[in-house]
């Protein structure tokens, strides 16, 4: 039975039991506690936790998941993988334990020809919470045990286990409860008798049924938590691993040999000439390739692009591990296009998006592989040298400084350094590396992690949200008379606040737009008791709740009547910029191609930036064409309409959705000129495109592998920008005394003349430098067994200093000579040391000598054995620096 068919049987079965089939959420689910969806219940968390009402009483899904915690174990064992599909059925206050067990038993044991999974009932074992582990279940989960017994499982195949095995929670405060796990006995060839308690290789878990009964107030460990009380509704949350069921039903030994994975191994074997099963190390690499290719495909399909932070870094690591594994299998040519295309065809039946997003996926993957191949060439050489140096010193640990240099200078990820060092029998000083990375982040991104505007944590917001959601009336009204329903001060919900406090106000309804979907928040005032409080920020910290950050200039209490007034000028500017964002998105898709999908955006009055998927930059002519297309759309004054409709209907009509965003069952579709621009959007817009005025494209740049960014000004800001450019052209034509259409040619000629003058000046400077060579060589003095050519060359620095040192060394190449020059400026002396081949053979290393030489001038230096440079800040030590090199040479 194919994997896709198993999944379809699961959801079909539960649909027949009154469950709504919910499509898989994106792997980039909007949950700040997770990088990726890592469990089937994640999209249902708000409903299970009670923070949002569930749209369904019963639901079922096939959820794609990614977990990379054990990425280093992937391939080494056949149990670990980074991508998997979780089957689940859920009940939100509807049916409970008995029905959940009955449904599971029916599906698992029903013959395959009747639509079930067809497992032999005699092979099924189950576990339940055992006696003595939980105060509410002193005799264990008797209800679950009785339900399984009624289903037909003999007592000896029902095992009671501890909280660690048969109690489930999310690891944080929230719902929890006992669970029951279903196991399949694979037979004595896989391990000893005795059920799951004896051996979990022979007895393989396929399904976990969680019976959520309790609200946990604190969680310290799997079996250490505090119970606040019972849940308001009893929930069912189950998860069954699709890949695990598939390999049992397909008669293979592990998930790597199933129909959705093994063909990738076969393709990698074909490309490398390495037969799977012939050699352990090759098998490990082939499994790494198969797993990571599928994970990378699914992540890129859902909108992740390779990068250096968070999700992008995980994807980059997966793709680079594939490339390196294939190199170790002997394949030096590009590999990702072929491997990804195989995985795409395997996954298309289950997830059609892998086909519609293919152009963007393959573009990002190809660009990343090209980049990494260059990184491998440069970084591997440096790492090899560092390994040799470390071993020569007798150490077993590669320095954290070297690992950091590899990462910072060559883009070599630390995990690759760890992996390659381990292959050479070395550890890496990870603590030092981590400290250096922390220092760099602190310097580069101070305060960047602070959440804008929010004054407390999510828990406090969730408590206020439980009182009711905040209706947004701002699509039609900019002024609303309303009531204060909540005040949050210093992280706590309060009933009143005094003047001088900065608080967050919750209103019964609001016209203020909260920052969301790339659109900046509204500004304005909240008028209370005759006093105007300026609204500093508006946020939506948890779904359904809008908070208004204000500085109180008077008293305010819950229950006060207030008037909320949005600033109409800034709102109109935000509407112009947001509609212009839709215009530029449509223009990009029309002129660049359908793969130019949105990867992020930000807009505020007068300005917008838009990130989109692309593997190369836009030409100047294409940028001009895009700007013109946008302004034609503005001139055509297309009507802007919005319509509420079911999410599935919106997708069916081609409405563009932002990857990773969570959308409710009913969505708002904003259209410009019908199908030309049709997007899911909750933002505010002008009534027609003509009200944008105009758009001026500022520029375009890369913001990460596979992602480009355009920036633009709109309305009066665009007019001012163009007026400033016109004034600049007028000024330049006046200075250069040419007509505007002659300006480019005139500037080009001036640039060419300047380049030629610089070339001549450089040639003259080189002749002058080389004219000193004879005099400097004539001043050669002995230093032990070496000839020391030392001189001061004031004003000579950088490449000129290197050129002079190299020329002098060439003159004395037949001798064991060391060239030492000090130049630079008066307050910043620069030093260089160069050695001949025979000098190096006798023990004179430029890299070691420079460290001795720069000390007297208060500097630092480094380099290779043949040439090294340094610089300092103390010119009084120049003579001492030259003497120090002489002394060091004499001692060799």
Swiss-Prot record:
Gene3D superfamilies: 2.40.30.130, 3.10.310.40, 3.30.54.20, 6.10.250.550, Bira Bifunctional Protein, Domain 2 (3.30.930.10), Threonyl-trna Synthetase, Chain A, domain 2 (3.30.980.10). It is found in: Cytoplasm. One of its GO terms (cellular component) is cytosol. GO terms for biological process: alanyl-tRNA aminoacylation. One of its GO terms (molecular function) is alanine-tRNA ligase activity. Its cofactor is Zn(2+). The keyword Nucleus does not apply. It catalyses: tRNA(Ala) + L-alanine + ATP = L-alanyl-tRNA(Ala) + AMP + diphosphate. SUPFAM superfamilies: Class II aaRS and biotin synthetases, Putative anticodon-binding domain of alanyl-tRNA synthetase (AlaRS), ThrRS/AlaRS common domain, Translation proteins. Keywords: Aminoacyl-tRNA synthetase, ATP-binding, Cytoplasm, Ligase, Metal-binding, Nucleotide-binding, Protein biosynthesis, RNA-binding, tRNA-binding, Zinc. Its main location: cytoplasm. The keyword 4Fe-4S does not apply. It comes from the Bacteria. Zn(2+) binds at residues 578, 582, 681, 685. Binds 1 zinc ion per subunit. Its EC number is 6.1.1.7. Consists of three domains; the N-terminal catalytic domain, the editing domain and the C-terminal C-Ala domain. The editing domain removes incorrectly charged amino acids, while the C-Ala domain, along with tRNA(Ala), serves as a bridge to cooperatively bring together the editing and aminoacylation centers thus stimulating deacylation of misacylated tRNAs. Catalyzes the attachment of alanine to tRNA(Ala) in a two-step reaction: alanine is first activated by ATP to form Ala-AMP and then transferred to the acceptor end of tRNA(Ala). Also edits incorrectly charged Ser-tRNA(Ala) and Gly-tRNA(Ala) via its editing domain. Belongs to the class-II aminoacyl-tRNA synthetase family. This is Alanine--tRNA ligase.
